[in-house]
Amino acid sequence: MQPTLAPAPHPSMQTSAQDHADQVLHDQLLAAHQHLSHPQQPRPQPPAAQPPHMQPNTTSPRDQNNIDPAISGAAMLSGPPQTPPQPEPTGQESPKTYGKRPLSTSKRAAQNRAAQRAFRQRKESYIRKLEEQVKEFDTMSEAFKALQAENYQLREYIINLQSRLLESQGEVPELPGNIDLSQPRTDLNVPQPGAGPATTSSSAPAPPSGAQQAQPPQGAASNDDMNSLNRIAVAGLGMRKHPNEEANYLGNNFTGRRTRPDETQADSEVTKTEQAPHGLPMVS
């Protein structure tokens, strides 16, 4: 027996299968090209259903065994289109999205450096200004101390001149216009009025007996007047007098007072006149 050959396919059927395969390849290439050019776009929709005349004829397995291998290979290509795999993002896309961050970070770092530099400059200028002010204050403090020492020296010099003027003339000069004796100064240690007479009375010599008690010496009265005038002048000027000077001044005036010759003569006359009836002098 001779093997029976399958009937040759119809030419129109072979042409339709070839056209369908070409259409599927064209759609796949177009989808792949669109996906590469627009990666962010959604996945393309599957191709629409083809018209009935473009679809391949479904045959039974018995008929497929009898089909020519060349025709069957073309028919297998006409199967349902498979979606192409999504391409992985290439290295060219990452610099586009990541390139902005280095620029912004570098710009922010430059701004921070500029702000820090400006802050350091302001801080240094402020520190220099404070140092200059401290130097000026130190200079002013030294000048103030020098003026204060000079003022104290001038006060002592004025007090000495005032005491000598009172000793030579015995007149009190007029008070300055800016000094008021009715308002005593609390910040200065002015000697109390009661301290002067107590010192003079303690340092003065004992008065003589007899007629000398009735006639006090004129030198002591004049010295008391001068001392009181001196105290009034010092209190009026509002100046502090050195305690050593006052003690020396009072000591020089009262402790070493010389006796006058007329006082000794008066004492001898009194002793001569006051004699007892028996002719002997009265000794007190």
From Swiss-Prot:
SUPFAM superfamilies: Leucine zipper domain. It is found in: Nucleus. Residues 103-126 are annotated as: Basic motif. The keyword rRNA processing does not apply. The keyword Cell membrane does not apply. Keywords: DNA-binding, Nucleus, Transcription, Transcription regulation. One of its GO terms (molecular function) is DNA-binding transcription activator activity, RNA polymerase II-specific. It holds the Pfam family bZIP_1. Residues 102-165 form the bZIP domain. Residues 57-67 have a biased composition (Polar residues). Residues 1-10, 41-54 have a biased composition (Pro residues). Belongs to the bZIP family. This is Putative transcription factor kapC. The lineage of its organism: Eukaryota, Fungi, Dikarya, Ascomycota, Pezizomycotina.
